[in-house]
Amino acid sequence: MAGSSPLNHHLWSSPSRTVEEILAEDRNSEARHRYLLELARKEHERVREEAARIYREQLAREERERLLAERRKEEERIRLEQQIAAENARLNALKATRIEIPPLLPDPVPAPSTVNGKPTLPAAVATEAKRCPSEPSLVNGIASNGVVEAPAAASIKTLEPAKPAASAFKAAGSATTAAPVAPIASVQPSTNGVVSAVASTPKTAPPAPTETPPDRYVEIHRNLKGLRKYMAEQAKTNLKLKQRMGDMRREIRKSVGQLTTGGMAANKDKQQKIKSILTEALSNQVESALVDPNNFVVEPRKPVEGATNNDPLLPSIFVYLINIFAKAAISQFINEAGARPETADPVGICVAAILSEPDFLWRGASLIDILIAKFRIVCPVLFGYRGSEKTEQGRQRLGWWKESGQWISEQQHMDRMTGLGAGFAAISLRKFALSKKQNPYPPRFYWMAMAKIVNTPPAEISNTQCVVLKAMVQNYEAKFIEFYGSAAIAALRTALIDFPARAPHKSAAVNSLEVLAQMLKRDTGLDLG
């Protein structure tokens, strides 16, 4: 090996030992082996110590990263808590702020607005308002006695609402006497489609009321809450009532929730189910106590010759289930018709069909006031109430709902108003010309609700009113025109053209009315411009 080439010597040499050392004579000696083992042991110790050092450094780095991450989390938590505390402080400051709103001065009598020299709908209905002071319209807490009536030749009687007694559900309530009849104007369409007013002014006008009467629909709603508590008290001692009342309530809610847009035939079995439940309730098989229906209607009623139910009292379970039926209908309008307004129509058909049943009338008229009282609470703009959407009082007046003590979002509010506006139209624009039944809520109430909205002063127009008005018109313009002809066209022109034009702020809700007018022109050829 001594004569090997330098290349081979370089390739086979060890970093720590030379070839001569490897091939030395004592390479297999015990001392040589001990020496090599000691070198290997020292190398092993060095590698182990180096690995342990690296491992300790890695653990230290990981611990440092963990501590940094914990610190960042705590800093983020503190930052968020500081933001929440600041927001709560600002919110509390806003809640504590109260702005004193001075009372409004009486509005001046506006001059009749004209289009091409001809009076428009607001001028005509304003003439009616002077002759119909029966239902005061509140504006920001101020009572206004001007109320717009539907175009009809007949007069509407107004009665002082009955005051609920402490024992309203245990004894018959006392009826109040009727007030003098207030004649109203008769609105007739002219040949060119413009509304004109023909007034029937009495020789001696009744004196104006000195104070605003209480809101009867609010009283009815309060009485219905009392009835619900009264039924719960009865159920504690009447086991038959307790067992059946819950089943009947659930069946009515279920049937109303299953109403579809497939037509009357598709919903016939649901209507029949509701009718059979109410018929059973009217027969009072569960032996519920009797109540005075005058506590749940706007005007006290006297016996009517030939009426099916002329008794002064009705079974409380029947009135209670009418209330459940009305509540289920309102829930459908809010939860379903808000996103799909067309779903309000089958519910409106069912409401009109059930409440117009001759067996369910009391002293010649339906109990639809129970349903309308709920409309008054959840959608006050239909009854002439208005207010600012930016104030607590204004939102309350507009029917802006609260959940868990907090106002719902604007989108939720507008969806509710859309469903309720469509539901109101679905109930009030039902055709009974070919039916032997009595229409529980004639179209004149639709006209009145529309007039109360479009007669709003420009400064008080709200997005809520625009959303409700659009929902009332969309999908129901044909029915409206079918009832009132050219007068309805003039009313639609006022609602979709003139009313949004007077709004001081052109919001999306205001513009949607003008867009609806354009859609009607495109889809039906109805030109309101």
Swiss-Prot record:
Keyword Coiled coil among UniProt keywords: yes
Q: Does the keyword Nucleus apply?
A: yes
Q: Gene3D superfamilies attached here? A: GLE1-like (1.25.40.510)
Membrane topology qualifier: Peripheral membrane protein
Motif range (Nuclear localization signal)? 227-234
Entry's Gene Ontology BP terms: poly(A)+ mRNA export from nucleus; protein transport
Q: Where in the cell is it found?
A: Nucleus, Nuclear pore complex; Nucleus membrane
Residue ranges annotated as coiled coil are 36-101
- Please name the InterPro entries in this protein's record: GLE1, GLE1-like_sf
Kindly state which keywords UniProt assigns to this record, in alphabetical order.
Coiled coil, Membrane, mRNA transport, Nuclear pore complex, Nucleus, Protein transport, Translocation, Transport
- Listed GO molecular functions? inositol hexakisphosphate binding; phospholipid binding; translation initiation factor binding
An annotated GO cellular component of this protein is: nuclear membrane
Pfam families on file: GLE1 (PF07817)
Give the domain of life. Eukaryota
The UniProt subunit note reads as follows: Component of the nuclear pore complex (NPC). NPC constitutes the exclusive means of nucleocytoplasmic transport. NPCs allow the passive diffusion of ions and small molecules and the active, nuclear transport receptor-mediated bidirectional transport of macromolecules such as proteins, RNAs, ribonucleoparticles (RNPs), and ribosomal subunits across the nuclear envelope. Due to its 8-fold rotational symmetry, all subunits are present with 8 copies or multiples thereof.
Entry function: Functions as a component of the nuclear pore complex (NPC). NPC components, collectively referred to as nucleoporins (NUPs), can play the role of both NPC structural components and of docking or interaction partners for transiently associated nuclear transport factors.
Q: Which family does it belong to?
A: Belongs to the GLE1 family.
Name of this protein: mRNA export factor GLE1
Q: Which organism is it from?
A: Chaetomium thermophilum (strain DSM 1495 / CBS 144.50 / IMI 039719)
